[in-house]
Amino acid sequence: MSRSLRKGPFVDHHLIKKVRAMNLLEKKSPIKTWSRRSMITPEMIGHTFEVHNGKKFLTVFVSETMVGHKLGEFSPTRIFKSHPVKKG
């Protein structure tokens, strides 16, 4: 079930605060975050985030097509190793 439109998108308070501060200073340094649940908003376009995947931080550069998705969607947590090939 999706989030109610009445509530608006969820973005962690500390994360949006950092983005707004960087927009005012016109800085584009990477923002390190553990908040995979935060939704990408239009004011985040052009910023680089380092999103934690449970083991390490993966770099995510936000573009226009990512708006409306969550940060965690671009930082996979599982590694798929192919199924073994049967010889014979």
UniProtKB/Swiss-Prot annotation:
The keyword Ion transport does not apply. It comes from Chlamydia caviae (strain ATCC VR-813 / DSM 19441 / 03DC25 / GPIC) (Chlamydophila caviae). One of its GO terms (biological process) is ribosomal small subunit assembly. It comes from the Bacteria. Protein S19 forms a complex with S13 that binds strongly to the 16S ribosomal RNA. Gene3D superfamilies: 30s Ribosomal Protein S19, Chain A. This is Small ribosomal subunit protein uS19. PROSITE patterns: RIBOSOMAL_S19. The gene is rpsS. Keywords: Ribonucleoprotein, Ribosomal protein, RNA-binding, rRNA-binding. Belongs to the universal ribosomal protein uS19 family. NCBIfam families: rpsS_bact. GO terms for molecular function: rRNA binding; structural constituent of ribosome. GO terms for cellular component: cytoplasm; small ribosomal subunit. Pfam families: Ribosomal_S19.
